[in-house]
């Protein structure tokens, strides 16, 4: 069951699906239970897979192919014996924002290919450049067969500048109105454009 089952007493033969992070899976295997690792940060394929402004509306989040491929489902904190209790990984897709089968294909491919390699490849044998080349080829092949994958060859990628805060030079400066604001719509008077709530 979902990792919430750890909160109410877990059945002796239960397997835990760790979706809220890795903590549930770690707790499960350290207490002798099996776990399936499916944390949202790496395995929820209903998140945006490219720059959100370039994608169909999604539930939120940003999960590009490279991040899926980088996932290691066996946390480093586990012993070799505990690691044997990790059954593997699972990809998830909630369809509130995915109205058609074609859109499902778009959201899962090629990220599901990356998740498959995460499942069957030892981390030390993985190569992102090699996989990326193969994923480009796989996307072209899927398209030829009539599927609707995300076109990896047109990936925009993350926008690092969007992750940096911007502090503009006008903040806190005196504002001089060239035309007085209307007395019928005074808002916050002279502070309406400088209080950080109403505008710049």
What are these regions, as identified by a protein language model?
Residues 1-165, 175:
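Substrate-binding groove of N-acetylhexosamine-processing glycoside hydrolases
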Residues 162-200:
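Disordered, acidic Ser/Thr/Pro-rich linker "stalks" and the adjacent N-terminal cap
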């Amino acid at each position: 069951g979902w990792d919430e089952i750890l909160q109410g007493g877990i059945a002796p033969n239960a397997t835990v699906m760790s979706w809220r992070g890795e903590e549930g899976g770690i707790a499960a295997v350290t207490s002798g239970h099996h776990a399936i690792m499916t944390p949202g940060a790496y395995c929820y394929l209903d998140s945006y897979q490219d720059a959100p402004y370039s994608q169909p509306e999604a539930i939120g989040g940003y999960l590009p192919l490279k991040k899926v491929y980088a996932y290691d489902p066996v946390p480093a904190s586990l012993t070799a014996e505990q690691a044997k209790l990790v059954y593997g990984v699972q990809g998830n897709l909630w369809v509130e924002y995915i109205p058609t089968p074609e859109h499902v294909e778009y959201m899962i491919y090629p990220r599901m290919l990356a998740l498959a390699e995460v499942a069957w490849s030892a981390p030390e044998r993985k190569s992102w450049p090699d996989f990326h080349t193969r994923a480009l080829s796989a996307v072209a092949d899927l398209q030829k067969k009539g599927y609707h994958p995300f076109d990896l060859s047109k990936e925009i990628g993350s926008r690092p500048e969007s992750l940096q805060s911007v502090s503009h030079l006008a903040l806190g400066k005196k504002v001089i109105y060239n035309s007085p604001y209307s007395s019928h719509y005074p808002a916050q008077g002279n502070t309406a454009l400088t209080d950080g709530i109403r505008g710049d």
